[in-house]
Structures are given as C-alpha cells and as structure tokens.
Amino acid sequence: MQKLIKTSCAIAAEEIGKEKADRIADAAQKRYEELLAENAGDSKALQPHTFRRIYPAIAAYEAFRAEGIESEKAVWYVREYFQRDAAKKVPHLQRMIRMFGLAKKIPKLFMKISVKSFGPEAGFKYEFPESRGNEARFNIVRCPYYETCRRYGCPEITRAFCDGDDAGYGNLHPKLIWGRTKTIGRGGDCCDFLLQYQN
C-alpha cells in the first residue's frame, strides 16, 4: 500500500477505529491506482510530485469524504502525515547542518535544489525578486500541487502540502529564517519562498 495512504489512514484509525480506517485505506489505494492510470502521461519531472504526494493525497481525501468524514478533518489527516514525516526528518537535517557547519550554505543549496526539483518541466513557474544578502528568495506563481488538486475538485488539500513545507523548513537552524508569508494553496497570488541566513 502507498505510504501516504497507509500512514494517513493509520492516523485516522486513532480516532475512527481500525476497521473503518482499513476500509478507507483499501478504497484510497484503489482510487490511487486509478489516478496513476488516468495520468500515466505525466512528465518524468512531474511524477515525483504527483505519483508520490499529490495523487495519494487526493485518493486518501476522497476516500475519507466518501466515508462521511468532514472536509476539514479529512484535510487534517492528510496534513498530519506531512507533519509527522517532517518531525522524523528535521532532526536528522538539523544534525547534519550542525555537524558539517552548513547553515551559511543552506540558502544557496535550497535555491539550487528547489529550482531543479520544482522546475518548469514539472509545471512550476517562477519569479525571482532581487535577493538581499545570504538568502534564497523566489516566488512560485504556478503550482501543479494546487492546479492538480483543483482539477480533481479538492483544492482545499493543497494547504496540507504548504503546512508540510513550514514544518520541514521552519526550524532547521537558529540562524536560518523561514520567511514565507503566503501560498497559492492558502489563497495567495503566489508562494513567496524565503530562506535566509542571519548572523
């Protein structure tokens, strides 16, 4: 079973019970496989986003809703998957940054990795405001996470991805300031990414 589906349903089981959660997981897995078949033509650059994150989230959300779970709660179960995933990964990143003295280099690395992994080939469109000092600053003005979720009638789950970014980047190091103030998924006109090193 796909990881996001399995974990978000296990989180739901804490409240709704294992039997119902297992039924939802089975339905979500089936829907996920349908989404993969429907979108087999996704570009290689887009697939890491859609196949691993977006389609599983849509499938889980739809399955939660089909079982009568309110929209806000269904979004919360998906969001909680990303929160718990970040809680596992961030301490490792913090150790690496401290151990190798990488804090100063992180903004440039973040910019390089972001533009490569979230590039135009994957459906993202950028603007690059002027950077000041040691920072990564860019605006995403077109986001396939939002566009795909909207196409499937559930743009509200996009904020679960946005919140996952905040959990992942918001506490990497005391001198690294995560300064994003808005996202398309939360109703903004862009996602104004900012990761800044401050002495």
Where do the model's predicted regions map?
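Short, well-ordered coil loops that connect the C-terminus of an alpha-helix to the N-terminus
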Residues: K18, E70, P174-K175
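Solvent-exposed, non-transmembrane amphipathic alpha-helical segments
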Residues: A28, Y32, E80, R84, ...
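Amphipathic interaction/junction segments at domain boundaries or subunit interfaces
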Residues: R52-I58, E62-G153, I157
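C-terminal non-catalytic interaction appendages of large macromolecular assemblies
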Residues: N134-I140, P144-T148, Y152-N199
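N-terminal, charged low-complexity regulatory/assembly segments
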Residues: M1-F64
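Amphipathic, alpha-helical segments enriched in basic
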Residues: A28-L35, N39, K44, H49, ...
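Residues embedded in well-ordered secondary-structure elements
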Residues: H49, E127, K182-I184
